[in-house]
A protein has these predicted regions:
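Expand to "…catalyze enediolate/carbanion chemistry for C-C bond making/breaking, isomerization
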Residues: 1-278
């Protein structure tokens, strides 16, 4: 673990102990997390006892992502853009196939993040496999996008009414309810509008907060969540910069060798046969 990762661990410990953080999230979907990055994030997360790793897979039937989630010891897997009963069935059946008898050891959730998914939600709850689903994540940014309204409307009354309706129906089915998308201190009134017991967690891009306690968090908690993501992005940048520098040195050496060799033979070989882009 490098110095920056140690600082990330200290920040996570602070967030867990003082601001009701219960997990960290990585996305194989929109974020495009690579396995090497996820493994480094797992190392950081594992250094803070009691924090779980959540993995958003690339689709409802992203089987390789599920196997990768097993390798990472993920506590939860989340399928994005599940909009129909059939897509939900595909996800649950894929999870049953991958996890087998160990399916009960992981929580499986789906993102309800479009208006089409909202309209189909009652039918989703009627599928025979619904008892295997543990919860839903209401994705507000994609939700407003699917409704043709701007990101700034994630805390609007229209989105709140829709979210409260989803939460009630999910809770009637015994499901956990999570809210994400555009989460900042400005979202606290939105979260406080949920009836008691209807909101289990809310999440930023990387940090997962547990309710109801986290609803009372001061603004500094959200600033620290942003700080963690900045540190994570810097750590990722540093990692790939080392690889890039390593290749750059090799490229420079090979180009010099190429030009020296070319000078020795260029009088005997047609120029058009040797074209090297700098």
């Amino acid at each position: 673990m490098n110095k920056l990762e140690s600082q990330m661990t200290e920040l996570l410990l602070d967030l867990k102990q003082n601001y009701h953080v219960s997990g960290i999230k990585a996305e194989f979907e929109a974020e495009g997390t690579r396995m090497e990055e996820a493994m480094r994030l797992k190392d950081v997360t594992s250094s803070v006892p009691g924090l779980g790793l959540n993995i958003k897979i690339g689709g409802c039937e992203a089987i390789k992502d599920m196997f990768d989630a097993i390798s990472l010891g993920a506590q939860r897997i989340i399928a994005p853009m599940v909009e129909t009963p059939y897509a939900l069935q595909k996800f649950i059946r894929a999870a049953q196939m991958v996890y087998g008898d160990d399916l009960s050891q992981v929580e499986i959730l789906v993102n309800i993040e479009t208006y089409a998914a909202y309209q189909c939600f009652s039918d989703m709850l009627k599928i025979p496999e619904i008892s295997y689903l543990n919860g839903i994540v209401i994705g507000r940014v994609d939700m407003v996008g699917s409704m043709g309204i701007g990101r700034a409307q994630v805390n609007s009354q229209k989105v709140l009414d829709l979210s409260l309706d989803l939460a009630k129906r999910a809770k009637d089915q015994g499901l956990k309810v999570v809210v994400g998308g555009g989460v900042s201190v400005d979202a606290i009134p939105f979260f406080k509008a949920f009836p008691a017991g209807h909101l289990d967690r809310f999440e930023t891009r990387k940090i997962i907060f547990s309710c109801p306690d986290a609803i009372q968090n001061p603004e500094i908690a959200f600033i620290k969540a942003v700080q963690f993501e900045i540190m994570w992005l810097k750590n990722k940048r540093n990692y790939y910069s080392v690889i890039a520098r390593e290749d750059e040195e090799r490229i420079q050496m090979m180009q010099e060798r190429y030009h020296v060799s070319l000078q020795k033979i260029q009088h005997t070989i047609p120029e058009h046969e040797f074209i090297l882009t700098e």
